[in-house]
Amino acid sequence: MLASLSLGLTAALLWGMHDYIVRLVGGRADARAMLLVALVVGAVLLAPISLMAEGWDRFTEFTLGLTALSGFFYALGAYGLYRAFTIGPVRLVAPICGAYPLLSVAFHMARGGEAGLGVWAGVLAVVLGITLVTRGEPGEAQGGRLEAIGWSLLAAFGFALTFGFSQWAAETAPELSVVWVARLFACLTA
């Protein structure tokens, strides 16, 4: 339990740092180039531990298909996130992008999974937390608000489908191999 909590908090911290950096350089760098750099660095860092993981023999064609979909939707979602943060304002786009857990839970339920009150409370806490943190963010849109909303929605749907397909694939193969192969497909997509 403590290991899961530590990993979750570490992931949240790193993802937050990532989003902050994207916001800092978003207006000065090409979104696709930033995405490709992040994907390649992630793939390189994951490679040693993923390739040494056991269970590659359980990686079937079906798993490969799910993993390819996960990688495709991750690249799509991340590109949407980068574009949304470039346009801003953060107080508009972050809550929309951050609402992907709602869609992830819906995907899980569509596959026959259950979501109890605790899951929905967690999702609500995430969305409200993002909204509260970004509420006071200064800045105006660098483009049309509808365009920013569109890219934000693409990010939310992309991330929700990423996690949905990744979790499905991880039911049949080791998580590390699923994440790494999805990252490779995302690199090819970007």
Residue positions per predicted region:
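Glycine-/small-residue-enriched transmembrane alpha-helix faces in small-molecule transporters
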Residues: M1-A33, A141-S177, A182-T189
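Structural signature of hydrophobic alpha-helical transmembrane segments
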Residues: M1-L14, G55-Y74, G113-L128, A173-A186
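Loop-to-transmembrane-helix transition segments
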Residues: A3-A11, V37, A47-L51, G55-G80, ...
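Structural signature of transmembrane alpha-helices in multi-pass secondary transporters
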Residues: A11, A38, G42, S70, ...
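C-terminal ends of transmembrane helices
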Residues: G16-A29, A75-L92, I130-Q142, T189-A190
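Small-residue-mediated transmembrane helix hinge/kink sites in multi-pass secondary transporters
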Residues: R23, Y82, H108-M109, Q167
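Structural motif at transmembrane-helix junctions in multi-pass transporters
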Residues: G27-M34, G80-I96, G113, E171-V178
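Hydrophobic transmembrane alpha-helices of multi-pass small-molecule transport proteins
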Residues: V41, L46, A99, L103-F107, ...
